[in-house]
Structure formats: C-alpha cells, structure tokens
C-alpha cells in the first residue's frame, strides 16, 4: 500500500464504513479530523495491532510484519449493465465484477496455491461474519431509533390531547361557575334567619309537590352559598368544582361526568343533592367529545341470506339506499330500493362497495325440523319393494297393473292413456308389492323421472309388436340416472305381429342386454290381456327385491314423498304420499313442502281407512292447509307450531326467489324488446287441472312451445276447479283459460262470459297441445312470400314515342302477367324492381303471355333495357305462420 493512502481509500479496501474506521483509529490512539487525511504504513501497523488485541489475538512479530510489508493485495471493482430477456420485455441488471490479486516482493516466501486459497477463504469468512455483525448492529440501532421516534410522537400527541382536555375542562368549569353565580344573583337575597342550633326536622319520605309552571324556582340556601366547607352532596351547582381545585382538569372533567350520570339527559330537574341542574343542553358535560372520526375505511362483515331487499342491504352497509342502487346500476342490475336481490348479486355489490359478505343461515326452523326428523332411530326391518311401471304410451302398462290388481282402470281413463301417477299396493303370493303407474306420453317426463327416484325396481314394458320407442329410451335413461335395477316385460306376445327377439335386439342397441345374451337384465314375455307370464314377472320382482335387501325403520315419526296431489271439492286438499320411514298415523302433524297440517284421515287405493301406513305403503292424506307440490318431501313433527313455522319460512323463501327471478326475466324482456324494436307475441295461459302432476306436465309442455316469435306465458296454474279469482286474473291479462278435467263454477262463468275470456275444457293432453299450437299460430299472423311465376328474355329493344324503350322479349319460363310486379336482371344481378307499363302481342294489349311466346314489354319509369336482360315476373302471397 502506498504512503498516500487516505482513510476513505483504506475503508474501501478493507470493506468497512468510514465512520467505523475513524472510531477504530481513535481507539488505537490516533486522532484524525476527516476521511481525506493520509494514513501511513506505521499507523496501519498500529491499527492492525490494536484490532488483533481487541479480538484476543497476539500481535505479529517484526519479521511477520516485514513479510506482510513485502506483500500487497489489490482489489479491483468494475461495474457494467447486462440486458436480460424476460418474456416480452427486457430488463437491465447492474453487475459488479470484483477481482483480487496479491503481489509478493522478491525475497519473500511465496504461498502455495492451497495455502493462498485457504487464506483467502478464511479472510472472506471473517469479513463476511464481520459485515453480518455490523449489519445486525446497524439494523438494531435503526429499530431502536424508530421506536424512540414513534414513542416521542405518541407522547407528544398524548400531551397535546391532555392539554386540550384540561383547557376545555377548565373553560367548562369556569362557564359552570359563572352560570351558578348568575343564577344566585338573580334570586332574592333576603331570607328569614335560620337557627343553626335548632334541630332540623326529619325529611319527609314523600316527594314535595311540584311547583307550578310559571312559579320561580326556590331560592338557594344561605348556608349553601356561604359554607364552602360543607360536604359535596350539600353544595349547590355553583360550587360544584370548588373542592376539586387541587385536581387536574382531566380529573375534574371525569368527576363531573360521573356526577351527571343520573341526569338521564334531561335539561333542568333535580340533581342528587336536590339542587337545580343547568338548564342548557350539555351544560354539565365537562368531558371530551364522544365522536372520533375514523382514520381508515370501515370494512363491515354483512350477513346475507338467500335473498335480501336493497333497503335492508343499505342499512347493513350503513349507506344510503341510493348509493346501493347506483352501484347496482353500474353492475348492470336495474333494481329499486324495495326490490329483492339474490345472494350472489348482493355479495357482488357488497364487495364492490368495499365490504365483506358472509352467508347467513336463515333456516332456523328448517334446522329444528331436520334435528327432530333425525331423532327417529330404531331397528330396521324388511319392507316391501316399490316397483314403478314405465314404458311408451299404449304399450300396456296400466293393463298389466289391472290384471295384477284384478281391476279395470285402463278402460276408464280418458283417451285410454294414463295422465297421472297411480299408486297401489298388492298382496301377491310372493308378498306385498307397491306399484307406481307412470304416464307414457312425452309431456309427462317429470312424472316419469319422479317415479324413477321413488322406486326400488323399474319394470320396463315394451310392446312386442311395436318395439323400442322414444319414451322407452327415456325410461331407460331415468332408471340409469336413478341407479335403479331394471326388469323388462315384453308385452302383447299374444298378438299376431309379436316379435320378442326383435325387441331384445333393439334393446341391445340401448345397452340393455338380456340374460339370454349374456347380460344381467331379466326379460319376461307376458300378455296383460290373457295373464300369460304374469307369475314369472312377479317371481322376477321378488328375486330382485331379495337381492336388494330392502329395509326401513317401522316405528317412530314418518317421512316420505308426495306422489300426487289434488283438490277435492268435498274433502279439500288431498295428497297421495309414499311412506319411506316410520309409521304415519291419524292425528300426526306433518310438513309437506310449503303446506302443513294435521292428518284428519288416511285412505288406501280401495277407499278404506287404515289405522296407519308403514314403509313402502302409499296412502291418501287429508288435512293439509293447501295442495302440495308433487315430489315434495313430507315429515312428521312434534307440534303444529313447528310445522307452521317451517312452512311459512319455506313459502317466504320461495316467494322471494320467485320475485328475484321474475324481476330478472322482466328486465331481460325489456332489453330484448329494445333490441328488436318490437317484442315477441305473448300468449298468456291460466291452467287448472285435477291433480298437481298434470299441472306440472301441462305447464312444461306448453312453455316448451315458445320460440323467438311467440312466447307462451303461464301466468297462473293450480289444482281444482276454475274459480272467480282465476277468471279475474285471466280477464285482466287477456289470457286463455285451460281446464284439464275440471270445470268453472257459476261465479267464474259469469265473469268469463261478461269479459269474453277464452275458456277451453280438455281431458286428453294431446288435445291441449294441439289447441294451444293453433291459438299461438293465429297470433303469429301471416308471412309474405314472393313466388316467381314467369321469366322473359330480352331479344331486342325498340323505341316508342309514347312508351319509350320497349323490350322485344321471349317468355322462356312460366307466365308473364300484366298486373304483377317485375324485376330486371342483368348478368343474374337485379338492377331494377318495378311494374309493367305495357304488355303487348302483335300491337294488342294482353293480360298475360305464356311460355314460348314473343311479346313487347314496356317497363314503367325505366328505359335502360338492353338485349340479353331478363325480366322476372313474380307475385306476393300470404302464408299463415305456424309453430
């Protein structure tokens, strides 16, 4: 190292801060005034010895010092920039290259490479450890400095607040004292002398009568004005702070607030000592203001149920309703302040406004119901199987059940088809079996799906002469989706065109493989008319039921599913239910969807009244508050109150969900109307049917007829006869009333006749769909179509002083008529559309010219006809539009 090394340069070489190097030099006994002073070699040696002593190492011998003086180490640093490609952009990185070289004078012993490497590693490790310790010390020093700064700021703020509180308390105390003095000065000063030695009479327990409104307040006691040493509870309001002069202003303010705790916020009146309080509002409040402005945005956790109104959401967010409505408009949701919105929309707008939304559990009554239903635990016993008969329409499902039950249900059904689910239980030689008969018509898809979910075994009836049909394939899919085993009954084998093998091959294409073909599906050939093979079918059902090991709890509260429901004029709401667990008895309280009630009576399919219904037994229940939806679950509860609470809660949720959905669809209709310029044609319907399943099937089938030109809208549907309210709603909305196996009462007929409402009665679902199609087609109007009736080719063009350009033409196709519109085509491109001015043949006006005939054609208001053009004659016709 040269003799001209400065302290700053030395600090860079040894990688030490300049301040620390100055401290080390001062510790070694060398005083330097600045980092630019020169450090000699002897001073460096002295510093090295000091550092070695401070680290507990012996100083170097003179010969070692001489050897170290003969060796010099140079450190070189070079900085450069490197460009790095990172994806689509480029990043510039600063890179520092450090080089270190050691030079030894001649005569000094050169270190071996291993010794040099070890020495370098040792020095690097020591330097790294030293730097780490220094960095930790600096970080700790910075942390302590920051904490001291924060603490000083907090103390300063606290002192300032304390000073402000003391100042405010002092001002309020002075104001209170001044008010008390003014009050005392305004009262009469002459009083009768009071004998202090006489004993005071005891205070009466009863309150003194109130002074009249206009009377002046009683004068203060002279001893209260003069005696400053009296107890605090005997002093008047003027000397309230007299005994607190030695306290701080904050303590006086605190004590003043505690003394006013019994004032109850009313100006005037009496305090605890019987004196008058200050009449001004807040006159005795010596404490600081209670409100503090928040320093950060307040984030609230808002509990939101399935639906919530905009007003309730705004109240929970502590915002104005208009702000929430504005946020909804920005999100594309048009809602009013009283409108209900769903949970997802409410959660999105809550997050948009900077708060957190959590899902609220508003199913307290539902949870209590589930808890009570879960208490039904007992020993499971074997139960009868539930078998659903499915298949295509007119394949013999009901006839099969008629033979098993020895009844004639099929002959009494309208149109010879089943239009609702029938539930029966039959005592067979193989045991009790419960049967569900489902409709086969395409409109009753939901009924078939519901029957597949309730059943244990599906019997698929396929006609041997008809084969696999669309509803047959649909029944197979329902059975697969429900995970129910399948048994195929090939019916009508007694007919001449029966081919059971063809049926099996067609079922094979639907992945239904018979046992004869190596599969696992039992297929039985039967005849529902003669009874052939019925016993084999019952045997197959019994074997399948034994394999399933069907069990259920036969005691305790009952629960199950509604199969069908209707409204009987004499008996009220009637629900056909299938018990799945427990025992249903007369007098039980049950909840069924949004309906509830007490079981007044039970009826089986024969009309008898059983004492109870166990698992897998279908019965009719009377006593519900309304007609339940087909497919709803029912459960027996302890009391009517719980049943009513659960039903009302479900009804409220369903109504709110319906309102939310209606609002959304109404807004979509408005936007669609604005987009098209004119809205769709709408056909409003009011549907009333005898059973709930028929209502569902009709609603789904008729709404499915809607397209982009017309929309079928079911404004109301229900079970039972057509009532006065149904007629009024139909008249108000100009709807067509459809009665399916029901009739209108006298009052409804009067309204229908007076308002001209379209009323139609049906008993077969085919007729309903066909009639609605016709009515909807009438609303569509007609469509204008253009039909080309003739084409003439221009051969030459003549000029006429009266008509202008006349095209000598040959009719090459169809007929050209005089009073029909025409188009002029050139190179198969329409260049003009208008009408004929003249049509002549041999200089005579004619009405039409047929194929293969020459004629002269003058086009009105067009003279640019050229040879080779084609004149196309067409007519416009009206075609009725259909669905």
Swiss-Prot record:
> Per the record, which residues fall in region G1?
391-398
Q: Where is this region: Disordered?
A: 53-90, 171-294
Q: Which Gene3D superfamilies match?
A: P-loop containing nucleotide triphosphate hydrolases, Putative DNA-binding domain, N-terminal subdomain of bacterial translation initiation factor IF2, Translation factors, Translation initiation factor IF- 2, domain 3
Where along the chain is composition biased (Polar residues)?
81-90
Q: Low complexity compositional bias: what residue ranges? A: 172-185, 256-265
State where GTP binds: 391-398, 437-441, 491-494
Give the GO cellular component terms, alphabetically: cytosol
**Region G5, annotated ranges:** 527-529
Region G4: start and end of each range?
491-494
Q: Where is the composition biased (Basic and acidic residues)?
A: 221-238
Q: Does this UniProt record's set of keywords contain NAD? A: no
Annotated spans, G3: 437-440
Query: Which Pfam families has this protein been placed in?
Result: EF-G_D2, GTP_EFTU, GTP_EFTU_D2, IF-2, IF2_assoc, IF2_N
Q: Which family does it belong to?
A: Belongs to the TRAFAC class translation factor GTPase superfamily. Classic translation factor GTPase family. IF-2 subfamily.
Looking up NCBIfam families in the UniProt record yields: IF-2, small_GTP
Can you say what this protein is called?
Translation initiation factor IF-2
Native species:
Stenotrophomonas maltophilia (strain R551-3)
What taxonomic lineage is listed for the species of origin? Bacteria, Pseudomonadati, Pseudomonadota, Gammaproteobacteria, Lysobacterales
């Amino acid at each position: 190292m040269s003799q001209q090394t400065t302290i700053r340069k030395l600090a860079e070489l040894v990688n030490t801060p300049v301040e620390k190097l100055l401290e080390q030099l001062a510790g070694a006994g060398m005083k330097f005034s600045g980092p630019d002073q020169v450090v000699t070699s002897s001073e460096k040696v002295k510093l090295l010895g000091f550092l070695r002593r401070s680290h507990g190492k012996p100083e170097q011998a003179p010969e070692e010092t001489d050897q170290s003086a003969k060796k010099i180490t140079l450190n070189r640093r070079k900085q450069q920039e490197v460009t790095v490609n990172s994806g689509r952009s480029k990043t510039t990185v600063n890179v520092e290259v450090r080089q270190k070289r050691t030079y030894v004078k001649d005569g000094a012993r050169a270190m071996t490479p291993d010794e040099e490497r070890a020495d370098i590693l040792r020095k690097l490790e020591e330097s790294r450890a030293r730097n780490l310790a220094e960095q930790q010390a600096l970080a700790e020093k910075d942390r302590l400095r920051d904490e001291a700064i924060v603490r000083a700021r907090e103390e300063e703020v606290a002192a300032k607040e304390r000073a402000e509180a003391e100042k405010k308390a002092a001002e309020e105390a002075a104001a209170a004292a001044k008010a008390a003095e003014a009050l005392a000065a305004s009262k009469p000063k002459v009083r009768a002398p009071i004998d202090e030695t006489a004993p005071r009479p005891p205070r009466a327990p009863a309150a003194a009568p109130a002074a009249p409104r206009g009377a002046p307040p009683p004068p203060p006691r002279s001893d209260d004005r003069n005696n400053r040493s009296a107890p605090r509870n005997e002093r008047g309001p003027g000397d309230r702070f007299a005994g607190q002069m030695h306290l701080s202003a904050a303590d006086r303010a605190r004590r003043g607030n505690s003394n006013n705790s019994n004032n109850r916020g009313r100006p005037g009146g009496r305090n605890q000592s019987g004196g008058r309080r200050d009449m001004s509002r807040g006159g005795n409040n010596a404490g600081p203001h209670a409100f503090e402005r928040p320093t950060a945005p307040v984030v609230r956790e808002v509990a939101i149920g399935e639906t919530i109104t905009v007003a309730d959401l705004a109240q929970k967010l502590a915002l104005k309703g208009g702000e929430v409505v504005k946020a909804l408009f920005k999100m594309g949701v048009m809602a009013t302040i009283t409108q209900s919105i769903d949970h997802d929309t409410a959660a999105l707008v809550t997050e948009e406004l900077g708060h957190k939304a959590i899902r609220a559990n508003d199913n307290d009554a539902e949870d209590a119901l589930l808890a009570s239903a879960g208490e039904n635990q007992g020993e499971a016993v074997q139960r009868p199987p539930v078998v659903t008969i499915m298949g295509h329409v007119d394949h013999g499902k009901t006839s099969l059940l008629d033979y098993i039950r020895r009844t004639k249900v099929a002959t009494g059904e309208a149109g010879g088809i089943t239009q609702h689910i029938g539930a029966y239980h039959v005592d067979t030689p193989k045991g009790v079996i419960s049967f569900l008969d489902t409709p086969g018509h395409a409109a009753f898809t939901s009924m078939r799906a519901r029957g597949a979910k309730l059943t244990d075994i599906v019997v698929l009836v396929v006609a041997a002469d008809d084969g696999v049909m669309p509803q047959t394939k649909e029944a197979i899919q329902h059975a697969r989706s429900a995970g129910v085993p399948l048994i195929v009954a090939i019916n009508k084998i007694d007919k001449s065109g029966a081919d059971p093998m063809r049926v099996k091959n067609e079922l094979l294409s639907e992945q239904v493989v018979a046992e004869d073909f190596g599969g696992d599906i039992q297929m039985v050939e039967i005849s529902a008319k003669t009874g052939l093979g019925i016993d084999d079918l019952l045997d197959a059902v019994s074997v399948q039921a034994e394999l399933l090991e069907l069990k259920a709890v036969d005691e305790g509260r009952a629960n199950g599913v509604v199969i069908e429901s209707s409204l009987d004029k004499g008996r009220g709401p009637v629900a056909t239910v299938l018990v799945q667990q427990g025992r249903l008895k007369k007098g039980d309280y049950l909840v069924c969807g949004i309906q509830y009630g007490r079981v007044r009576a039970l009826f089986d399919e024969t009309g008898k009244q059983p004492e109870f219904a166990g698992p897998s037994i279908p019965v009719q229940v009377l006593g519900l508050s309304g007609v339940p939806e087909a497919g709803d679950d029912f459960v027996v509860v302890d009391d009517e109150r719980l049943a009513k609470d659960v039903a009302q809660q479900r009804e409220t949720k369903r109504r709110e969900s319906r309102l939310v959905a209606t609002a959304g669809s109404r807004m979509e209709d408005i936007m669609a109307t604005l987009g098209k310029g004119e809205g769709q044609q709408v056909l409003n319907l009011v549907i009333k049917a005898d059973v709930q399943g028929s209502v569902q099937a009709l609603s789904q089938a008729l709404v499915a007829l809607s397209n982009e030109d017309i929309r079928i809208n079911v404004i109301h549907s229900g079970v039972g006869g057509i009532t006065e309210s149904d007629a009024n709603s139909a008249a108000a909305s100009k709807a067509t009333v459809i009665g399916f196996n029901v009739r209108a009462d006298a009052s409804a007929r009067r309204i229908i006749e007076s308002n001209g409402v379209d009323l139609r009665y049906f008993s077969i679902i085919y007729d309903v769909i066909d009639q609605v199609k016709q009515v909807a087609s009438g609303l569509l109007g007609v469509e204008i179509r253009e039909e080309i009736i003739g084409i003439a080719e221009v051969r030459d063009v003549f000029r006429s002083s009266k008509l202008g350009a006349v095209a000598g033409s040959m009719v090459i196709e169809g007929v050209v008529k005089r009073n029909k519109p025409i188009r002029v085509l050139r190179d198969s491109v329409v260049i003009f559309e208008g009408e004929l001015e003249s049509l002549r043949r041999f200089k005579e006006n004619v009405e039409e010219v047929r194929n293969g005939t020459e004629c002269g054609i003058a086009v009105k208001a067009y003279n640019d006809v050229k040879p080779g053009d084609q004149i196309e004659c067409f007519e416009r016709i009206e075609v009725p539009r259909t669905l």
